[in-house]
Amino acid sequence: MTDISKDRFLDALEGVGRPVATAEQIARELDCTQATAADALAALAADDEVERANVEPDPVVWYPRDWLELTDRERIVPFPDRREIIVDQPSQLTRAQLSRVAHLTDTTRTGSYRYEVRAEDVWAAPFDSLSDLVAAITELLPRDCPTLIEWVREQWTRATRFRLRTHDDGYVVLEAATDSLLGNVAEQKLDDDVLRAPISDTEAWVAAEQVAPLKRTLYEAGYPVRDDRDLESGEPLAVDLHLDLRPYQQDWVDRFEDASAGVLVGPPGSGKTVAAMGALESVGGETLVLVPSRELATQWREELLANTSLTGDQIGEYHGGEKRVRPVTIATYQTAGMDRHRHVFDDREWGLIVYDEVHHIPAEVARRSASLQSKHRLGLTATPVREDDKEADIYTLVGRPIGTDWDALFDAGFVAEPEVEIRYVPWRDDDDRYEYAAASGHTRRRLAAENPAKEAEIEHLVDQHGDTQALVFVDYLSQGERIAERLDAPFVNGETPHSRRETHFDQFRTGALDALVVSRIGDEGIDLPDAEFAVVASGLGGSRRQGAQRAGRTMRPGSQSLLFVLATRGTEEEDHARSRMRHLSTKGVRVTESDASHSP
């Protein structure tokens, strides 16, 4: 008799699409005879695993003893024509796998997730071959989806139709797969000054200053360009890394070496900065590092001094507080984006440009980056998502994503998987509720964000986790001041002098502070390794990037990290909170929801 376990029976029910089935239907799903299925089902019934019912004159039907076993099971339903995948109750592994090939578009409170497979997802999928990508998709889906797979094959092929290379004489060549693509796509789409002259029926000479516009134009036309040019290594700079890279970090560096440009995508705490130092060692040329803040510039300097052979006189910072250009220069995006400081891009023969928190790249810096296409380029981010959806800026100006499954990092213990909980807080009283109902626009959103009842909930959570340092994020200064006073903690915001910021950050790192309240300046890569417990009191609308960054402040190795996201019950803030956590859901992080435990 063929062995049919309860799990195989439940799988068969899903294939049938009904909660009850006959032995004939089960046999058809499991590819066995009806007699074999009937005997196996009878054995399961004898073990109290399934139930049977006579529904004469119809045949006997079989169903699970516990109906919840059906509703709580993971179920994946593909819609190939729409290129959508709906998943109910997905496991952490399933969500992590889906994040490599699809884009999460919606979630529900009942545990359903909707993914869309976009052309950009296929182009940026972290697979070395089409067969590997197809295998990953087919392994996820419960049935064959030939139309979806065929579309994926077409998109993968489109990403190989155009290639940039360096001619033996040193100039840039655009190479098309066919003469039709060169004539009917490239020559038709590109401005007249991009292609200087034809070389053959499938090749053209590219103006060096037009490489970035070429890549952007063809990307928007549906043909991402493979960039195989020989890039400049700049003025030589010998650098030795004093750390051993983790296996996935070495893989990042190896893949960057092969491509000469790309974006490292990994959770905070995974060591992207260390991997970037490995890339600096590999390129062996003078390097410009661009960062969002002065604090990050200082951290980069300290990390380089501690972990490489670079000396203090080889590293310069370029921002509002200091302006020194050295073989390795760390500049803020804000300063580098100013017209009067544009010379920082040209002062030295840079061999490598590093864009830390690359999703923050301002338009001014992006435009100037268009002239840096001959340099090695490396972006670092926990999420390449930009809320204005300008992913093409990052893809074409810096490079395609180079990533590692978050799930693998969690399992290996390199990064702490946060426990994320969205807590819905009621209004403090009817007066607050009525004021919200009468308001509109920004005032309405701010009232929900600054709901006074959140302050009591935060105090309760901090008391409940009293043996752990607490980090509290706010978006509004007045709210931050009230919470800081309630917790007897410092409040660090954009108005806090840099010297005092560093004092408070050092106090938090060393354990001298039990709690710290921060505004948006704490969203980025400021290193707070002991922040194992965090509360988000208010957030930037539905910003997925901000959600990932704030959760990332707790994602450090060797810790049990907790993140609570507060949202006012019965307001649009509920949807915003779920949206902010959506990116974490795509990466395999389990996000739960509950009501506030401390009522006003």
Swiss-Prot record:
Motif DEAH box per record, residues: 356-359
SMART domains associated with the record: DEXDc (SM00487), HELICc (SM00490)
GO terms of molecular function: ATP binding; ATP hydrolysis activity; catalytic activity, acting on DNA; DNA binding; helicase activity
Family annotation (InterPro entries): ATP-dep_DNA_Helicase, ERCC3_RAD25_C, Helicase/UvrB_N, Helicase_ATP-bd, Helicase_C-like, Helicase_Rad25_arc, P-loop_NTPase
Keyword list, A-Z: ATP-binding, Helicase, Hydrolase, Isomerase, Nucleotide-binding
DNA-binding listed as a keyword: no
EC number(s) given by UniProt: 5.6.2.4
Start and end residues of each Helicase ATP-binding domain: 253-402
Catalytic activity: Couples ATP hydrolysis with the unwinding of duplex DNA by translocating in the 3'-5' direction; ATP + H2O = ADP + phosphate + H(+)
Domain Helicase C-terminal: 457-600
Annotated residues for binding of ATP: G266, P267, P268, G269, S270, G271, K272, T273
Coiled coil feature spans: none
Enzyme class: isomerase
Bias type Basic and acidic residues, positions: 590-600
One Pfam family, short name: ERCC3_RAD25_C
Gene3D superfamilies for the chain: P-loop containing nucleotide triphosphate hydrolases
Region called Disordered, residue ranges: 569-600
Similarity-based family: Belongs to the helicase family. RAD25/XPB subfamily.
Protein name from the UniProt record: Putative DNA 3'-5' helicase Rad25
Record organism: Halobacterium salinarum (strain ATCC 700922 / JCM 11081 / NRC-1) (Halobacterium halobium)
Organismal lineage: Archaea, Methanobacteriati, Methanobacteriota, Stenosarchaea group, Halobacteria
